[in-house]
């Protein structure tokens, strides 16, 4: 079974909720650094800070990550696969030293953030929709890293 209209709608609605509160981006990166403190140096907007502090660059990057997962959901529903819109993503991830375990950390942070953002609208179905979309995006990025 492919990615459904309902799954795409779940991702879209929670994406909209995510964007409404800038604190969600801080939460996302806080979770990442709790799991992988060494990853701090991979993010230019965190490298020289004492901790995770809100900034336009942090907001922009978080929205880009969540937005790409949302776009992946749309692609999965429409075509059954994900094609990167930015051909440089693989090279950027290589340059930053991203390795396979980092994708798992980001996935966990993304899913925890979405759960927090969704509040009483959270469900296993919502979680699965984000998980499937993220996994497809991560696979596409990893392929581009070769």
Swiss-Prot record:
The keyword Ligase does not apply. Root nodules. It comes from Medicago sativa. Pfam families: Globin (PF00042). GO terms for molecular function: heme binding; metal ion binding; oxygen binding; oxygen carrier activity. GO terms for biological process: nodulation. The keyword Iron applies. Heme b binds at residues 44, 64, 93, 96. Gene3D superfamilies: Globins (1.10.490.10). The modification Phosphoserine is found at residue 44. Residues 2-146 form the Globin domain. GO terms for cellular component: cytosol; nucleus. O2 binds at residue 61. Nitrated in effective nodules and particularly in hypoxic conditions; this mechanism may play a protective role in the symbiosis by buffering toxic peroxynitrite NO(2)(-). Nitration level decrease during nodule senescence. The modification Nitrated tyrosine is found at residues 29, 134. Its main location: cytoplasm. Monomer. It is found in: Cytoplasm, Cytosol; Nucleus. This is Leghemoglobin-3.
């Amino acid at each position: 079974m492919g990615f459904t209209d309902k799954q795409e709608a779940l991702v879209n609605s929670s994406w909209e909720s995510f964007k409404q509160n800038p604190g969600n981006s801080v939460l996302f990166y806080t979770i990442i650094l709790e799991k992988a403190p060494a990853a701090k140096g991979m993010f230019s907007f965190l490298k020289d800070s004492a901790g995770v502090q809100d900034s336009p660059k942090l907001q922009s990057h978080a929205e880009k990550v969540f937005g790409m997962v949302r776009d992946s959901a749309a692609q999965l529903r429409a075509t059954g696969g994900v094609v990167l819109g930015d051909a440089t993503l693989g090279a950027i991830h290589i340059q930053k030293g991203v390795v396979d375990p980092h994708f798992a950390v980001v996935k966990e942070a993304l899913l925890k953030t979405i759960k927090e953002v969704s509040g009483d609208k959270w469900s296993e179905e919502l979680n699965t929709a984000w998980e499937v979309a993220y996994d497809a995006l991560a696979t596409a990025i990893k392929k581009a890293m070769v």
